[in-house]
From Swiss-Prot:
Membership in a protein family: Belongs to the ARR family. Type-B subfamily.
Protein name per the record: Two-component response regulator ARR2
Compartment(s) where it occurs, according to its Swiss-Prot or TrEMBL record: Nucleus
Functional note: Transcriptional activator that binds specifically to the DNA sequence 5'-[AG]GATT-3'. Functions as a response regulator involved in His-to-Asp phosphorelay signal transduction system. Phosphorylation of the Asp residue in the receiver domain activates the ability of the protein to promote the transcription of target genes. Could directly activate some type-A response regulators in response to cytokinins. Involved in the expression of nuclear genes for components of mitochondrial complex I. Promotes cytokinin-mediated leaf longevity.
Gene name of the record: ARR2
Amino acid sequence: MVNPGHGRGPDSGTAAGGSNSDPFPANLRVLVVDDDPTCLMILERMLMTCLYRVTKCNRAESALSLLRKNKNGFDIVISDVHMPDMDGFKLLEHVGLEMDLPVIMMSADDSKSVVLKGVTHGAVDYLIKPVRIEALKNIWQHVVRKKRNEWNVSEHSGGSIEDTGGDRDRQQQHREDADNNSSSVNEGNGRSSRKRKEEEVDDQGDDKEDSSSLKKPRVVWSVELHQQFVAAVNQLGVDKAVPKKILEMMNVPGLTRENVASHLQKYRIYLRRLGGVSQHQGNMNHSFMTGQDQSFGPLSSLNGFDLQSLAVTGQLPPQSLAQLQAAGLGRPTLAKPGMSVSPLVDQRSIFNFENPKIRFGDGHGQTMNNGNLLHGVPTGSHMRLRPGQNVQSSGMMLPVADQLPRGGPSMLPSLGQQPILSSSVSRRSDLTGALAVRNSIPETNSRVLPTTHSVFNNFPADLPRSSFPLASAPGISVPVSVSYQEEVNSSDAKGGSSAATAGFGNPSYDIFNDFPQHQQHNKNISNKLNDWDLRNMGLVFSSNQDAATATATAAFSTSEAYSSSSTQRKRRETDATVVGEHGQNLQSPSRNLYHLNHVFMDGGSVRVKSERVAETVTCPPANTLFHEQYNQEDLMSAFLKQEGIPSVDNEFEFDGYSIDNIQV
């Protein structure tokens, strides 16, 4: 039952002395529902003390009907949990569903389950009886919280609302306006921040598009630009040129340091390749080469002096000769007028103990059966020359054909060891006979050379000669002596066939193409070589006194008597003999020389010579023709039997010297 006296909020408020001017939460409308009248009276007094407007009900159904009639007549409801007609939780549900008012539950039962049930059903608070005034003073906060979330100004703007409610509504509206303003400000800030972010993203996208569209322009090195680059590099120096300085000197807009660095690297690679090609083609621009060094050939003569002949005769110490030769191995000598250039020849490969198979040409080739002259015996690496030998003579390069008719091993030297066939150009010869120099007794076999000797005049310019072009050195002529015809004629008169130095007239310049084997070939050669002047040629075979270390060396002699008289060719000594195939003995050691017409390799290296013996051609290993009728067994037997064998006439004489004395 509702207490009408207390249910009138304005009347009770006026009687209590309240006014509309009291601030919030005064005049808060409260509906109290409880079946205990004592508890109901106590609550009414405490709520009125707090300036609330109170309405009392002792039944739950009466309170629910009152709320339904006046949905907007109350601000908050306080209900007991245990009532006889309706459970307090049931009322809580109806009020919450129909009026949506805040409901406070109260009970003497403080069990946790009951409190939890009230909260779960929608109660805003749970008060334990007896209720204290301190708890009632703060019930207004639930009204504010509820109104803040669900209060609608349009629904609560009617005249039926009391003044206290109007004040409360105005205050709530002010709060909501403030909240709306703050939220609008926040929303504006959020929108502005989002706008700024979008603008930043757009700017970044534009930057990316600009960076992608603005690629580095490719530099095209035109001819003018490259010339500026080369001029800057030449001014700075190739070694000292750096991209930064080159860029400053060029001063080209749009050109970067990276472009200059890349082009400089390519330019240096080009210069290295160009320098390598020029050095490979001849080393003519080498910094260690002078104008006088740009010729070919070993250091065999210096300013017209025959150093090796001077060393043999004792006028030049062997140590000095060795030093000069060692210094000259890698340095070409100066070419004299009227002389042909000859490539550097390795003097260590004079003898090679292998079986060469050398082609002589046109099906008449003669090869030696045994090229191993001294089987198992090491030979010296340098050949000594006799006094009077013209070492630095006119020579020409005649490459030997490398075809092997019978599949024998090739004895052709390498590129640096090409054989040189040269003829003497010296017209002077003060020696009328051969002088054999024995290495073991140099003081007895050497003599002082006169100043008019051919050693001191190796390069005459007044020699009448005929010339012919060379295949390997175009434009270089080789003077030859007329005395070669005498050698050919004397060989024909003796009955032998001269099989050497022929073939110079062949257009192919093959040294072995025109070597004859029969007498009719010699006549043809005589007709071809009428105007040739080949002089000062000879062959010296020498053997050591010790048979175990014997060796054969080819040397050059300058005597004109080698090609004149047969009596001079018959001179011999009786130290040791070498038995030939026809019963003739080759004497070794010997002080006399049997001089034969031959062509030798310049600088004391390999010689190629021809002999007057019929059908024989001699050469040392590595492209020199050996006497075919004297095989290895004959020579070895001769060297081993040199002791105790009497002197026998022969056409070949050998002068021996120790291999150990050969200068390297």
